[in-house]
A protein has these predicted regions:
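Positively charged n-region of N-terminal signal peptides that target proteins for export
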Residues: 1-4
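Conserved active-site beta-strand-loop modules that form the wall/rim of enzyme catalytic pockets
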Residues: 223, 251, 258-262, 274-277, ...
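Short beta-strand elements that form the blades of beta-propeller/WD-repeat-like
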Residues: 56-71, 104-119, 147-159, 164, ...
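Surface-exposed loop/turn elements that mediate protein-protein interactions on large endomembrane-trafficking
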Residues: 38-48, 73-95, 120-141, 161-179, ...
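N-terminal, intrinsically disordered, polar/charged segments of Gram-positive cell-envelope systems
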Residues: 21-69, 76-82, 86, 90
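Repeated scaffold domains used in trafficking and secretory/extracellular systems
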Residues: 49-60, 98-109, 141-152, 180-191, ...
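C-terminal motif of bacterial Sec signal peptides marking the signal peptidase cleavage site
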Residues: 13-16
Length: 408
């Protein structure tokens, strides 16, 4: 059975802040772990529009991409929905008969899409690129890496003491030394800066499980910006490793201007309150922007999600009732109740209404939403439509259907 490559997950894009309390240049150290082809400087390479891998953004301002396994075959099919003409087309088909695993899409801002592949015995790690003009090419990587960010030129892996770079054109992996002690998670990227968290403790984290947990009790979770081009790390803010009051850790949702947005679930008696936080990079302050109890909120579509246009966060889905989405618009700080219907709430998938769930935001200000079904390989799958953002937030369901691809 084919499986996804164990690539590290990340969340959505976010911005470079204009000011931050700390800035340190990473000292030159000997990189550990993976054996790379050579030691380089970050300044030796071009930097494009950085994105986080698996940030739920298989899209650009002009197109939305999906992957699916073709029923009864070993084929992996890639589809592209062009926002301009509202037509979904097939852009790739890969026969995975001789491959053991593969990654999700790596979609760059220039609408080039890539997939990582590995054979069954793990002896070969490669990637295939698909270009807007219909060309495709496959390259073997000089070594296996687990990319967490990428741009038009390369994919990157970040470690405590080094950064590895896989060149899309050559397949070569090079490294430079870095100092990102006890890196915990990659949260997102924007303007060529990577937002991440680090564990800050009084002592190095031990390998013994009980001692490890004991150290974490008195540790901090620090939110930082790492600049790939200058190899510098800046602190944003920190909080206890285990949030006070039993709340969840803050999940990054996206940015608009100097404001970074985070979602958090906070216990409130027998209930839970959903809290939206904003970190103002220019002021260096963290503030509560909106809070709402989750009483009566449920639904198959329940994971908070941010939607961006040209990298800027336009709106956030917070939570839902049975037939309404609660959506926060960053431009004015208002919450809108938007009608939708999620088929996962019904006993039989495909036999009920399916509309209004946001999928992506186009560069010209329209929302891609679910709207009914199409049959694919004998099974129902979501159909899509487009609607103006302001009309969508006002409750309109006057959708314009797109032309979904059908297998011949």
């Amino acid at each position: 059975m084919k499986k996804y490559l164990p690539l590290l997950a990340a969340a959505l894009a976010l911005t470079a802040c204009s000011t931050a309390p700390e800035s340190t240049t990473a000292p030159m150290q000997t990189p550990a772990a993976e054996n790379a082809t050579g030691e380089e400087s970050a300044a030796a390479f071009p930097i494009g529009e950085l994105r986080a891998y698996n940030d739920w953004m298989p899209c650009t301002d002009t197109a939305y991409y999906t992957l699916y396994n073709q029923e009864g075959t070993t084929n992996l099919v890639g589809l592209k929905l062009d926002y301009a003409n509202g037509v979904q087309t097939k852009v790739m088909s890969l026969d995975l008969a001789n491959d053991d695993s593969y990654s999700d899409w790596f979609v760059t801002n220039d609408n080039v899409v890539r997939v990582f592949l590995a054979n069954e015995d793990g002896s070969e790690f490669r990637f295939k690129s698909f270009y807007p003009d219909g060309r495709s090419e496959e390259r073997t990587a000089s070594q296996e890496i687990t990319p967490v960010i990428y741009d038009e030129y390369a994919a990157y892996v970040l470690r405590d003491k080094y950064v590895g770079r896989l060149d899309w054109q050559t397949g070569e992996v090079t490294t430079w030394s870095a100092s990102i002690p006890q890196i915990n998670e990659i949260l997102g990227v924007a303007h060529n800066k990577v937002v991440l968290t680090r564990i800050v403790s009084d002592m190095p984290l031990p390998t013994d499980h009980e001692m490890y947990e004991a150290v974490l009790q008195n540790s901090l979770m620090e939110y930082d910006l790492y600049d790939v081009s200058s190899n510098t790390l800046k602190k944003l803010f920190d909080e206890p490793y285990y949030p006070e009051g039993g709340g969840s850790r803050k999940s990054y949702m996206g940015y608009r201007g100097d404001m970074l947005y985070f979602d958090q679930s906070r216990p409130d008696g027998d209930d839970i309150t959903k809290v939206l936080w904003g970190y103002d990079c220019s002021a260096g302050t963290l503030q509560e922007l909106y809070a709402e109890k989750s009483t009566g909120c449920m639904g198959g579509y329940s994971t908070p999600q941010g939607f961006t246009r040209s990298g800027q966060l336009e709106f956030l889905f917070l939570q839902s009732t049975l037939d309404t989405l609660h959506i926060y618009k960053t431009a004015n700080g208002q919450v809108y109740k938007v009608p939708y219907h999620d088929p996962t709430l019904d006993a039989a998938y495909g036999n009920a209404e399916n509309y209004g769930r946001p999928i992506a935001l186009t560069g010209d200000g329209r929302v891609l939403v679910t709207d009914g079904y199409v049959q694919r390989d004998g099974y129902p799958t979501d159909a899509y439509s487009l609607i103006d953002l302001d009309a969508y937030l006002s409750g309109s369901t006057d959708y314009t259907p797109v032309q979904m691809w059908q297998d011949e």
